[in-house]
From Swiss-Prot:
Protein name according to UniProt: Proline--tRNA ligase
Domain comment as written in the entry: Consists of three domains: the N-terminal catalytic domain, the editing domain and the C-terminal anticodon-binding domain.
Recorded name of the encoding gene: proS
Organism: Campylobacter hominis (strain ATCC BAA-381 / DSM 21671 / CCUG 45161 / LMG 19568 / NCTC 13146 / CH001A)
Enzyme type, top EC level: ligase
Location of this chain's protein in the cell: Cytoplasm
Similarity field: Belongs to the class-II aminoacyl-tRNA synthetase family. ProS type 1 subfamily.
Pfam families per the UniProt record, alphabetical: HGTP_anticodon, tRNA-synt_2b, tRNA_edit
Gene Ontology MF terms: aminoacyl-tRNA deacylase activity; ATP binding; proline-tRNA ligase activity
Principal location: cytoplasm
GO cellular component terms attached to this protein's record: cytosol
GO biological process: prolyl-tRNA aminoacylation
């Protein structure tokens, strides 16, 4: 391709709301353009990268025997009502109606569509397993679209759905997909981790996220360098913490007057104890499909409540801040809540690490009073759940080594859905005994357009993008420093034809632009290599530039083609 015939409009400045490097450079370098909030066009350079990503995904998926399909982007509302997700999904699900008042949704995901495609067509265990996937446009009505392609409203996604006769076969496919996704992201040249994760709105039991490690990552990941355990902070677990010092001695449980001491710091300082021996009460207003209510969560005083764990514990859609009036109406006294003596209608949960702990300080459920010497016993087992947020320095649940926190960006997620959707939608098959059984399902997603941004978050410098050879729109750019130099132009064209015939994707910058403009565009767009054909040609030399590090090397004009073949073929 010749640059003079190509469409790659570059900009000197990025939009003011572009903060992350990927957002800034993808717009400035002419890969994408913004249409509206969370909406983007892909220009030729961007589309070329997207197609390369799709090709890698398709190649690896097809190797597993998965079959490519294409679901309608617009899905009848009754599919989502049948699965039970129509109201649960919330405002991110864009609901529309046609001229006949028929309801539809713009699909953010396609579990329902996949069930409809398979149900009543696959009827026997003999036809299982089957795995279908698509690479298609999705829409999620984000409340605050930001960070360019990392948090847009319209996006491209690969989503796959597998159907099985039993849980064992689903787990087998889950492991196959973990290996397949590992192959995909490795081929794309990414530094990533597969981590334990929360299933979120998709549901199901086991799930893993694939996180690319990046300084500007939106997620915190707990990692163990000793055994390679890794988990999203929403799902991370730890070895039960040990007391940092001896517990305060108390002969019996007593109530103490603690005027205006509403915080853990106040209480710990008053009793001169480590916060480890106090219990923190966190009051939340939990929102459900048909109601909202006050829920209490208890964790150690020096721990923080992990909100996703808390949502999963009580089954709420989301939390809202409870007003003072709502707290009082519920019969609670903020700052002095404890697990014993709560109003009968208050739902509460206790972090499992507190089970059977003794000599703790808790709220007395009475204004200006705390209880010392409290024992967390005599509570039903269902009250105890994992609620604490794991942090750096906590001990790995697999090997006991210290955990560290890294930043990551999610690029893929795989789920064991089990029978959640097949039961809800009455999608059944006949098993070996002739019994009607709901399918066991798996779900497997990759953020295709998000990967475009992730690659730049992981590969850029202050000048622009740095593409690797696996995903670059062109592996090589040949730059004619002066388009009026006939010898340089002729040599560059000959080299361009040789590279093209050798299968090296090459862009010839033959534009009648100043040399500085051409170099700035090369550094901004970020092709892996460039050959500069300029004044040195008179001495039989050209300059080979590697975009990563902008390392330059003088190469004989007679040897440059073989050098390029050695690097890029």
């Amino acid at each position: 391709m010749k640059f003079s015939k190509f469409f790659a409009p570059t900009l000197k400045e990025a939009p003011k709301d572009a903060i992350l490097p990927s957002h800034v450079f993808l717009i400035r370098a002419g890969f994408i353009e913004q249409l509206g909030s969370g909406l983007y066009n892909f220009l030729p350079l961007g589309e070329m990268v997207i197609e390369k990503i799709k090709a890698v995904i398709k190649d690896e998926m097809d190797k597993t025997g998965a079959l490519q399909v294409n679901f309608s982007f617009v899905t009848p509302s009754e599919f989502w009502q049948e699965s039970g997700r129509y109201n649960v999904y919330g405002k991110e699900l864009l609901r529309i109606k046609d001229r006949k008042e028929n309801g539809f949704v713009l699909s953010p995901t396609n579990e329902e569509s996949s069930v409809k495609m398979i149900a009543n067509k696959i009827t026997s265990y003999k036809q299982l397993p089957i795995h279908i996937y698509q690479i298609n446009t999705k829409f999620r009505d984000e409340a605050r679209p930001r960070f360019g392609l990392l948090r847009g409203r319209e996006f491209i996604m690969k989503d796959g759905y597998s159907f099985h006769a039993n849980m064992e076969d689903l787990k087998r496919e889950f492991d196959v997909m973990e290996k397949t996704y590992t192959n995909i992201f490795s081929r794309l040249g990414l530094n990533f981790r597969a981590v334990e994760a929360d299933s979120g709105a998709i549901g199901g039991s086991g799930s893993k996220e694939f996180m690319v490690l990046a300084q500007n990552g939106e997620d915190d990941i707990l990692v163990c360098e000793s055994c390679k355990y890794a988990a999203n902070i929403e799902a991370a677990v730890r070895v039960k913490r040990e007391a940092p010092c001896a517990a305060p001695e108390t002969e019996k449980m007593q109530k103490f007057h603690t005027p205006n001491m509403k915080t853990i710091d106040d209480v710990a300082n008053f009793f001169k104890v480590d916060k480890f021996f106090t219990v923190k009460a966190v009051i939340k207003k939990a929102v459900f499909v048909d109601k909202s209510e006050i829920v209490l969560f208890f964790v150690r005083g020096d721990d923080e409540l992990q909100e996703t764990k808390a949502l999963n514990a009580c089954g709420a859609l989301e939390f809202e801040d409870a007003s003072e009036d709502e707290i009082k109406k519920a019969g609670l006294i903020a700052g002095f809540c404890g697990p014993a003596g709560l109003p009968d209608d208050i739902n509460f949960y206790i972090d499992k690490e507190l089970k059977n702990e003794r000599n703790l300080i808790v709220g007395a459920n009475e204004k200006d009073y705390h209880i010392v010497g409290f024992a967390v016993t005599n509570f039903k087992d269902e009250r105890f759940v994992d609620l604490s947020q794991v942090r750096a320095g906590d001990c790995c649940p697999k090997c006991g080594a210290k955990l560290d926190i890294k930043k990551g960006i999610e690029v893929g997620h795989i789920f064991q859905l089990g029978q959640k959707y097949s039961k809800a939608m009455n999608a059944i098959f006949l098993d070996e005994n002739g019994k009607a059984v709901p399918f066991f399902m798996g779900c497997y997603g990759i953020g295709v357009s998000r990967l475009l941004a992730v690659m730049i978050e992981a590969g850029h410098d202050e000048k622009g993008c740095i593409w690797n050879t696996q995903t670059a729109p062109f592996k090589l750019e040949i730059i004619i420093s002066n388009s009026k130099d006939e010898d340089a132009s002729n040599f560059a064209i000959q080299l361009y034809e040789k590279c093209k015939n050798a299968g090296i994707s090459t862009l010839l910058d033959d534009r009648k632009e100043r040399f500085g403009v051409k170099m700035n565009d090369f550094e901004l767009i970020g092709f892996p290599f460039a050959v500069l054909v300029g004044k040195g040609l008179k001495d039989g030399n050209v300059e080979l530039i590697e975009r990563k590090g902008l390392n330059k090397k003088i190469v004989s004009s007679g040897e440059i083609f073989e050098t390029l073949k050695g690097i890029l073929c």
